From Swiss-Prot:
GO BP field: patulin biosynthetic process
Polar residues: bias regions: 292-304
Induction comment from the UniProt entry of this chain: Expression is correlated with the production of patulin. Expression is positively regulated by the secondary metabolism regulator laeA. Expression is strongly decreased with increased sucrose concentrations. This decrease is lost in the presence of malic acid. Expression is increased with pH changes from 2.5 to 3.5 in the presence of a limiting concentration of sucrose, 50 mM. Natural phenols present in apple fruits such as chlorogenic acid or the flavonoid epicatechin modulate patulin biosynthesis.
Family, similarity comment: Belongs to the oxidoreductase OpS7 family.
Name of the top EC class for this enzyme: oxidoreductase
Purpose of the protein: Probable oxidoreductase; part of the gene cluster that mediates the biosynthesis of patulin, an acetate-derived tetraketide mycotoxin produced by several fungal species that shows antimicrobial properties against several bacteria. PatJ acts with patO in the vacuole to convert gentisyl alcohol to isoepoxydon. The pathway begins with the synthesis of 6-methylsalicylic acid by the polyketide synthase (PKS) patK via condensation of acetate and malonate units.
Organism per entry: Penicillium expansum (Blue mold rot fungus)
Protein name: Probable oxidoreductase patJ
GO function terms (MF aspect): oxidoreductase activity; polyketide synthase activity
Pathway(s) it belongs to: Mycotoxin biosynthesis; patulin biosynthesis
Top-level taxon in the UniProt lineage: Eukaryota
Biotechnology: Patulin was originally used as an antibiotic and specifically trialed to be used against the common cold, but it is no longer used for that purpose since it has been shown to induce immunological, neurological and gastrointestinal effects. Genotoxic effects of patulin with dose-dependent increase in DNA strand breaks in brain, liver and kidneys have been detected in mice. However, more recently, it has been proposed that patulin might also have anti-tumor properties.
Chain residue ranges for the region called Disordered: 287-326
Protein location: Vacuole lumen; Cytoplasmic vesicle lumen
Length: 326
């Protein structure tokens, strides 16, 4: 398969919602000695009318209820349940974790995975963090933004997980998939498979561990990739020179440049003048009338609410509601 191209943009968001709300991640400022901290909520399901591909995923064995089994070569991971019940498997031993258990740790090198426990009510919320190893590739916000972004897009829109792409992203976050339990030295085999296939071979084939569409601190992600001989060719540094919109606006000349005999083609030749309304964008945000959504369930806006905020009189609101119901 060809290297992956993201389907959605989530960079710059401190709260990211994946799989239609099945998974919500809130990035927080980490405490001293930890390289990341986030609060994460898993739901068992999404009720109501949802897109067919999402419903199919929820009803399948691939339903996102937690990450696959993995281990961290250099970092200890910490879990603190806020509500609900967390299930966690560590080196084959499954535990049931509740808020009363306080913070628990999974030491570096332990094969583990966690999930929303079947005994949990509708949702489960947990705080996750990890020790700071000081390595370029480690569990941090850059990794999680890209893993959750790819996981979402691959399962919903790209036909499933691409093995090389998966290994490339996992290697970028000190998260490695172990070999089957019957394989001798399963952790070493898993680690070097991720490095050789994900970083070395994948890098040469154009597979990136990080994508700008998902990554808030892109400069940091670029610095990470530049540290690898096999990935530095994937980095394009021109973005560092891109000026902000304010700086670009300052470059606009006071008058329109002239183009001699070619000037007429740079002007509006239509006999009917172009009539444009006020610009609906302000500081990059759209403030015009929002179109109605095909799915207004689960608390998601249909666009009607936005129109009600923009229109003043009851008569105008009545027209909007009537039109939305047609």
């Amino acid at each position: 398969m060809a290297p992956f191209v993201p389907y959605h943009y989530s960079a710059g968001q401190s709260t990211i919602v994946k799989f239609g709300g099945l998974l919500t991640t809130e990035f927080l400022e980490p405490p001293p000695g930890r390289c990341f901290l986030f609060r994460q909520t898993y739901r068992h399901t999404i009720e109501g009318s949802i897109p067919e591909n999402l419903r199919k995923l929820i009803n399948s064995p691939d339903r996102p209820k937690g990450p696959p089994p993995h281990f961290h070569q250099f970092q200890t991971e910490y879990f603190r349940v806020e509500n609900g019940v967390l299930g966690i498997s560590v080196d084959g031993v499954v535990r049931r974790i509740t808020p009363e258990d306080g913070e628990i740790s999974v030491k570096a090198g332990s094969v583990h995975n966690f999930f929303i426990h079947p005994d949990s009510p509708e949702n489960m919320t947990v705080y996750l963090s990890a020790s700071d190893s000081g390595n370029d590739y480690q569990l941090d916000r850059v990794f999680f933004e890209n893993w959750y972004g790819y996981w979402h897009d691959a399962l919903l829109h790209d036909g499933g997980i691409d093995w090389i792409q998966f290994l490339a992203i996992q290697d970028g976050g000190d998260a490695y998939t172990p070999a089957p339990a019957w394989v001798p030295f399963r952790r070493q085999v898993g680690y070097w498979t991720c490095v050789i296939v994900g970083r070395w071979i994948g890098g040469l084939l154009g597979y990136k561990p990080f994508f700008r569409e998902y990554t808030t601190d892109w400069d940091f992600a670029v610095a990470k990739m530049k540290g690898s001989f096999f990935q530095r060719h994937l980095v394009h540094a021109a973005f560092e020179e891109e000026k902000s919109w304010t700086k670009q606006a300052e470059l606009e000349p006071k008058g329109k440049p002239e183009n001699a005999e070619f000037e007429p083609w740079t002007e509006d030749m239509s006999p009917a003048p172009l009539s444009l309304g006020p610009v609906a964008y302000e500081q990059g945000l759209f403030h015009g009338v929002q179109p109605g959504s095909v799915n207004g369930s689960n608390g998601h806006s249909t666009g009607v609410e936005s129109k009600l905020e923009q229109l003043g009189s009851r008569a105008q609101r009545r027209v909007v509601i009537d039109d939305a119901g047609k």
